[in-house]
Every structure is written in structure tokens, then in C-alpha cells.
């Protein structure tokens, strides 16, 4: 009886014959298709997002802020992400599930990174994301060679918030832009399938995306990248002080799934983000 009730409200008792994969999405992104990534933390919202056409469900360490109530992502543990990954996996239809590697789970050694990645994949992740450019290249390579698909994350990396002196726009100087180019090349050469680029001027995002050999998924990086990622709570208008690059897609809609569908459509047709939602 419980199983039948679950199938009724989730509506995904039967998985589709063809699931999306990270490598297929990466190839599509490089062909010019716009990729859509969105955070998800539980079965119901994962189900809404997957049905709406979201390509990648990111079980982000942002859960520390929007779910647990912390002021940053640093307190989040592998156990936390694994729990929410398992929840998301139960609601997913055909999206790729991307598990975020939390602070302290991969920086000390590649062995730590492998253990953390294995835990997240055993919970239901199809790939993992970790922050850092050239300094993390050897870790990315280690994981990829052992069968773990990896997404990189450069630019504003929230786990380094204290090193940055707060959540700040990056790549404001020629030196910083040059370093971002090196970081992008390093994670690409290490085998990352795609890379998240966060909080940089739109012109920098466009330049990096045009030169990249892998899809660049922007968050606060302008419209001229291969895809976008957003925090679920931001696109639903639930954040008290949303970032500049956020848009409330729930305004004028009747339900959550309509809001997520509007986000998906806006990314696909490149109407999101607009100029006012970008950094100059």
C-alpha cells in the first residue's frame, strides 16, 4: 500500500527507457543546446523539476543555508548531502543527479575525495561537483580515472567565502581573469565533464564559454554561457534577500511546477538572465 501511495504522488513508478547522462548533456551543450541545472533537496521538488525538463538536479551544499538555516555552506557534511541525495533520487524521473562535495570532504587528500564521492554515488548521485580550479585538478583527475564523473566549479566558490572576504563578484581584474582561464583549462584537462562558473561579469562569462572545450554552466555569469544553474528557493521567490542574478519565476504562475517550467523555458530561449540580472 505504501509503495502504491508513493507512486501516485510522485508519478514516476516507471522510469523512462532513456535517462539523461552527464556526458550526453555535455555533448549537447557543446552543440549549442542550453543546459538547465537546478538545486533540489527532497523527493517532491526533485519530481517537479525533473518533470519540468531540468537536465541536472544539483543536491547543493546550499542546503546548509536554505534548508538548515546557516549563514554559509561550511557546516554541511557528506552525511547531509548523502541524505538529501537519496531523497532526490526517489523523486527523480530522468534528470542527472549531481552531488555537491561539501567543505572538508575532498581538500585534504584524493583518498578523502574518493570516499566522499563514493558515499554520494551510493546514495544516488550520478556525478559529483567540487569547487576549485588548478589546485583541485589532480583530485578531479583521480576521481575521473576511478569512474566518478565530475563537474568543476570556479569563480566565486562559496566554500572559500572567508578567503574572499564575503560573497563577492570575481574576475574584476586582468590578473583574476587570467587565473580563471588557467583554472578552466586545468579542470578541463583533468577530465571534468562541465564546469560551474559563479559570480563573474557577463563579458568574462561569455569569453570563457566561447573558449571552453566543456560546457560552462553559469550562475551570475551572464547569458552567453552553455547553461544556467539556480537555487530552487531563489527562482520561487522564497529568498528574503535574493542575489542580483535571481528572478522570481513563481510570479504570475499557479504552482511550483509552472514556475520551474518557466525557468527551464527562459534558459532554453536565452531570455534569462537579462541585462539587469548580470554583473558588468
Residue locations for each model-derived region?
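Alpha/beta enzyme core
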Residues: 9, 16-250, 254-280
Amino acid at each position: 500500500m505504501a509503495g502504491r501511495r508513493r507512486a501516485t504522488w510522485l508519478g514516476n513508478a516507471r522510469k523512462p527507457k532513456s535517462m539523461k547522462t552527464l556526458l550526453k548533456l555535455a555533448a549537447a551543450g557543446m552543440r549549442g543546446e542550453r543546459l538547465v541545472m537546478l538545486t533540489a533537496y527532497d523527493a517532491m521538488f526533485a519530481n517537479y523539476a525533473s518533470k519540468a525538463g531540468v537536465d541536472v538536479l544539483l543536491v547543493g551544499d546550499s542546503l546548509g543555508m536554505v534548508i538548515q538555516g546557516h549563514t554559509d555552506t561550511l557546516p554541511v557534511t557528506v552525511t547531509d548531502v548523502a541524505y538529501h541525495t537519496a531523497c532526490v533520487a526517489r523523486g527523480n524521473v530522468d534528470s542527472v543527479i549531481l552531488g555537491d562535495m561539501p567543505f572538508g570532504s575532498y581538500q585534504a587528500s584524493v583518498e578523502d575525495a574518493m570516499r566522499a564521492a563514493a558515499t554520494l554515488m551510493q546514495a544516488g548521485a550520478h556525478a559529483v561537483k567540487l569547487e576549485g580550479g588548478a589546485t583541485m585538478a589532480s583530485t578531479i583527475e583521480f576521481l575521473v580515472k576511478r569512474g566518478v564523473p565530475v563537474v568543476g566549479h570556479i569563480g566565486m566558490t562559496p566554500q572559500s567565502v572567508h578567503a574572499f572576504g564575503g560573497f563577492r563578484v570575481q574576475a574584476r581584474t586582468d590578473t583574476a581573469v587570467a587565473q580563471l582561464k588557467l583554472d578552466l583549462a586545468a579542470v578541463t584537462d583533468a577530465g571534468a565533464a562541465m564546469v560551474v562558473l559563479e559570480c563573474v561579469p557577463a563579458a568574462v562569462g561569455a569569453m570563457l564559454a566561447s573558449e571552453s572545450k566543456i560546457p560552462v554552466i553559469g550562475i551570475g555569469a551572464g547569458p552567453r554561457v552553455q547553461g544556467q544553474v539556480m537555487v530552487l528557493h531563489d527562482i520561487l521567490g522564497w529568498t528574503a534577500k535574493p542575489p542580483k542574478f535571481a528572478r522570481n519565476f513563481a510570479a504570475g504562475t499557479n504552482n511550483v511546477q509552472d514556475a520551474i517550467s518557466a525557468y527551464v523555458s527562459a534558459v532554453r530561449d536565452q531570455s534569462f538572465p537579462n541585462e539587469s540580472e548580470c554583473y558588468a
